[in-house]
Amino acid sequence: MIKRIYMCILLITFVLVIVPAVNSQLTASEDLIDIYDESFGDFSQSYIAANGLPLHSLLTLGHYRIFDSLGNPLTLDDLVANITESDVTFLGEIHTDVVAHYLEVLLLEMAWDKNQTLSLEMFETDVQYVVNEYLAGHISEEHFLKSGRSWGNYDSDYRAMIEFSKEKGMPVLASNAPRRYINMVSRLGEESLLSLSAEAKKYLPPLPYPAATQDYENKFRAIMSAYHTMGPTISEVQEDAHSEKDDVKVKLAEGQLEEELGLDEEAFQQMLAAQNLWDASMAWSIASHLKQHPENRVLHVNGSFHSDYQLGIPEHLQNYLPNSTMLGVTIVPSYEFPDFSDAMQGMGDIVIVTDANLPPSH
């Protein structure tokens, strides 16, 4: 089970792991508190940029290991080569994983060329024009964050990717479905989307969107069961579901799961349809971009549930763009770091194991 990480670990962990890796530009008078930004709960990327510290200096093998789907070790260069050879790469993260966020920026920088496009779960399709306006320098960052409905952890976890994209003139896809329509489906069912105006439907994949596969439905039931059992920390729920999958299969067979969740089957199916709309929307955004720009490739950042085991977004993308080549990268924080466990096999084409003992990013 993923545990909540407390601030009291901060000094011990960072003194032993991070500080020796920091570039020599740090002076003796600059201690951990100078670098650590308490308002974000991690090493502030704005501090790193302002002081000219190379991002990779904070990332060593003391923080992550890279493996193929079977647990064979890979290098960072191996990973970048795989990214540049794929039409679409999914970077599946736990949203509080500080190492994942730094790796995402690093991989974006290392894989960058004129054909690279960034795609983010964290922005919704109806604010694509706002993202474009900010990247073009037309609006201020303050207005971008407000009008773009940025996540609360934007500054600490995603800003560096947007700023790099802005600097390089790289397209950024606001790929997720608007939350109001996700909520609509969870309450009223997916058929309710058909009543929307033609203007509203522009922000959604073609309707009706494909139903979730049975494997995806089983995985979602596992998540819902874990969520009900352990409480509302979603990053904990996502990872715990992998270790509890055998127990969930038994409960599915015995018909116990709906009773535990307090949901009837109709309510569960509507929640599943809402979750599935997220995945279909992100896949449709990526497919639409590549149909218009077939020379491009896409690096897409999403919560790992949306792409683990090649389920979710990859399934929909295969439907919308059958000939595309896809690479699934799952980033897994683990308390058994740096070991690759049997439970991680097949989670992604590439699995990056990170140190779960580090403080969360937010």
For each feature predicted by the language model, list its residue ranges.
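Bacterial N-terminal signal peptides that target proteins for export
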Residues: 2-9
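Bacterial N-terminal signal peptides
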Residues: 9-17
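N- or domain-start disorder-to-order transition segments that initiate the globular core
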Residues: 24-86
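C-terminal regions of proteins
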Residues: 42-53, 162, 276-277, 281-299, ...
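Acidic/histidine-rich, surface-exposed loop or edge segments in extracytoplasmic proteins
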Residues: 61-63, 84-92, 139-146, 268
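Solvent-exposed loop/turn segments at secondary-structure junctions
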Residues: 94-97, 123-127, 178-182, 304-307, ...
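Active-site-adjacent structural elements in enzyme catalytic domains
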Residues: 96-127, 153-167
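A substrate-binding/cap region within the structured catalytic cores of diverse enzymes
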Residues: 129-285, 289
